[in-house]
Amino acid sequence: MSANDIALKVAADAGRAAQELVLGLMSMPWGQVSPSVYETGRLVTLAPWLTGHGERVRWLIDTQRSDGGWGAPEGYGLVPSLSATEALLSVLRRGDDTGVGAETLREAAARGLRLLSRCLSGAGLSLPDMPAIELIVPSLVMLINEHLEENGMSVPLTLPVGMSAAPLEAVRAWVASEAEIPQKLLHALEIAGDAANGAAVAHVTDIGTIGASPAASAAWLGDRGPSEPGHPVRWHLEAIVRRHGGPVPVGLPITVFERGWVLSWLARAGIPFEVPPEMLADLRAAIGPAGTPAGAGLPPDADTTSVALYALALLGVPRRPDSLWAFETPTHFCTWQGEEGSSVSVNAHVLDAFGQYAAVRPAEAARYAPAIGKLRGWLLERQREDGSWDDRWHASPYYATVSCSLALHEFGGPAAVPAVRAAVEWVLDTQSEDGSWGRWTGTAEETAYALQLLLFAGGEERVRDAAARGYAYLLRVADVAEGPPLWHDKDLYRPLAVVRAAVLAAIHLAQSRSLGVRPISQV
């Protein structure tokens, strides 16, 4: 089947595609996530005894960029490049039999080292706001420098300007003391070094994960891995590596996160589909008094909680959003307790949750009106001069902008109208010649976000023309299984089903809105 045939099939029945997508969530309950260079590199170093070791090494070799680095452009490439380079140096030091020649390994590691040396010695390095980056970078630089010292190389890597090893040392001492640590730190337990091995502060979940992270799980299992094949954590890791034939994602499971986002994208767009009753029951049951985590091993967070609540309200089974009060601060809502920084997309999703519940339960609307007003004001203050928003949980401003704009469009009232209009203008001004949108290059995911904003909040001829061009682009790239990872974790990742739902929503909106979008036969 040609790409055009696929496009026509997808466009002809977004409802059927949405139904298949929702049913697929039941068959893969841990979630569907792209493999991670960072996490895969950590398993190469920490768990060479694990199934798929050779496949992981070869995958790292195959995904190295021509400039010697790994990962996305700009500062996003530092963490994956450090992890992959250190992993290859570990393989060389141990002399692992991976099926990859020693010369190939040496050349790839040397290219990685040259890029890292240039990158870290320069003054223009700007690092993104990624979880635990202030701990991960020093831990990897220290490991690489140990390799260099063993090989008699006298020029160690330096830390980025403004970054110190002191926070890492403090966390390692904290873990070693066996005192209770914040649950969110377990997601990056591998940075604790030897103290992670069997750390008493970590608790194995029912499905055998530590912190919903393969790297954290392998670091905690440590030297028991080879000798205890039946250990729950070993079993969990074996199950994960089979997903991609060796490489692993940065976070798994993401059960509640994935279901909340998929269902909300589809329902908000008005796509007809049925949700398995047990999925709705599971989603409702996951939300406790303190909210819900994205998946087992993670702390509750306002983002997952609010999107799950919003999806439930859209689907006709609303649940009071009172668990979100646990995340309220004097000015806004935090992602989790003790968060450093803030997130506009999280606050936009909290606005969605409160606003939609108030809409379907008008008798209770007064209870949430003050919070809705506070959220509106906070989001309006953080809009950039060009009309967009940016965020700490996604590399693309199109994700942040569609999250904020749609929440304000639906629940922000008259005071939010100018801001939404400015966002529409920014989207119109940043469309590429081929009809796509994207931070670095046009992508189906980012085009879907831009298209949704135009179709929900726009209306004049310029909007209709841009929407038609964006729709045509989506049809040309209908096979959306591939695409760059843009979501923030320790490394960038791509939640496949979530992105697929966003694209389906945009396609359905383009077909169903009376905005002059051309028929498929004319595209």
Which positions does each model-derived feature cover?
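An alpha-helical repeat/solenoid feature that recognizes helix-turn-helix modules
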Residues: 1-12, 28-55, 72-98, 118-187, ...
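Buried hydrophobic core positions in alpha-solenoid tandem helical repeats
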Residues: 21-22, 60, 112, 116, ...
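A short, surface-exposed, charged and often Trp/Pro-enriched helix-loop connector in the C-terminal portion
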Residues: 107-108, 473, 520
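Helix-turn-helix repeat elements of alpha-solenoid scaffolds
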Residues: 14-19, 192-195, 327
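A short helix->beta-strand "capping" segment at the edge of beta-propeller domains
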Residues: 13-25, 199-202
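Edge strands and adjacent loops of beta-rich recognition modules
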Residues: 187-201
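Nucleic acid-processing catalytic cores of prokaryotic defense/repair systems
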Residues: 65-70
